[in-house]
From Swiss-Prot:
It comes from Arabidopsis thaliana. CDD domains: YihA_EngB. Keywords: GTP-binding, Magnesium, Metal-binding, Nucleotide-binding. GTP binds at residues 127-134, 154-158, 172-175, 239-242, 276-278. It holds the Pfam family MMR_HSR1. Mg(2+) binds at S134, T156. This is GTP-binding protein At2g22870. Residues 119-297 form the EngB-type G domain. Its cofactor is Mg(2+). The gene is EMB2001. GO terms for molecular function: GTP binding; metal ion binding.
């Protein structure tokens, strides 16, 4: 199952994680982030009732299968400018102040029970080693060394809490899939990270980072499936989207389409997703706005 939004302890919008035979067309263009066109709901002068009903039906089907629609948004009221560029995310009434004015490192924890005990909302960042977690955090807060970046996979092996605007946390989780560690270390990572997901009541959402410069990786899909089955809300964040040309294999836009196709075949409702680049800043403001509406909905 996949939980798209979390409202304190209330679980909503649950969707069975089962294959589905019906395929939906993905309306996207990597080079033009304003890629989603909402079907227009307009009446015909000849037969207004029939045309309007058909248009509403088409729009509803499209929206439910492709877009992430937050609470407070009616499908019939959707317009193009409500969809964040480079994403499938609709902005609703819970979106608010999103800019980061101050950030401070709070602590590193080796176990979930050692994490901060206050009730501030948390948005966790997770991904394969060297997917760009630390770079994304530094991009979001616009400071170069808030999160330690390294070319050595598996550098971050603790749960790191950063307090933002004295009101919410960014949580930098250890990367998964690194090869140059012992099997015991991998087991420990799995145990304490999963413990964090399952027992952290203040967790609003997980940003699951996907490297757009490589084809879909089984370990990313396994992680997404595990999060879905355990009702952990997630947003797919495609990283390294500035690398428009492929040096080896397929282009990033082709890799993204391939990943989305697999997700559509396994999730009845597509989770929210967004394109980003820590180099160019692509998607930064849009992702922060999305994060704000998730936090505000959780905190109401």
């Amino acid at each position: 199952m996949v939980l798209l939004l979390r409202y304190r302890s209330l679980t909503i919008n649950l969707t069975p994680l089962i294959p589905k035979s019906q395929k939906f067309h993905t309306l996207q263009s990597f080079r033009n982030p304003n890629f989603i066109s909402i079907p227009k709901i307009s009446a015909s002068t000849n037969n207004p009732t029939t045309t309007t009903n058909r248009s509403i039906s088409d729009a509803t089907k499209f929206a439910k299968s492709v877009l992430f629609i937050p609470p407070g948004v009616e499908i019939e009221e959707l317009t193009d400018d409500m969809v964040l560029p480079g994403s499938n995310i609709v902005i609703g009434p819970f979106a608010g102040h999103s800019q980061i004015k101050e950030v401070e490192f709070v602590k590193s924890s080796a176990r979930a029970r050692d994490c901060p005990k206050d009730d501030r909302p948390e948005i966790a960042i997770l991904g394969r080693s060297n997917v760009g977690k630390s770079s994304l955090i530094n991009c979001l807060v616009r400071k170069k060394e808030v999160a330690l970046t390294s070319k050595k996979p598996g550098k971050t092996q603790l749960i790191n809490h950063f307090l933002v605007n004295k009101s919410w946390y960014i949580v930098d989780l250890p990367g998964y899939g690194f090869a140059k560690v012992s099997d015991a270390a991998k087991t420990d990572w799995s145990a304490f990270t999963k413990g964090y997901f399952l027992n952290r009541d203040s967790l609003v959402c997980v940003l699951l980072l996907i490297d757009a410069s490589v084809p879909p990786q089984k370990i990313d899909l396994d992680c997404a499936n595990w999060l879905g089955r355990n009702n952990v809300p997630m947003t797919f964040v495609f990283t390294k989207c500035d690398k428009m040309k492929a040096t080896k294999g397929k282009r990033p836009d082709e890799n993204i389409k391939a990943f989305q196709q697999i997700i559509r075949e396994n999730f009845k409702v597509h989770p929210p997703w967004i394109l980003t680049s820590s180099v160019s800043g692509l998607g930064r403001d849009e992702l922060l706005l999305h994060m704000s509406q998730l936090r505000n909905y959780w905190d109401q």
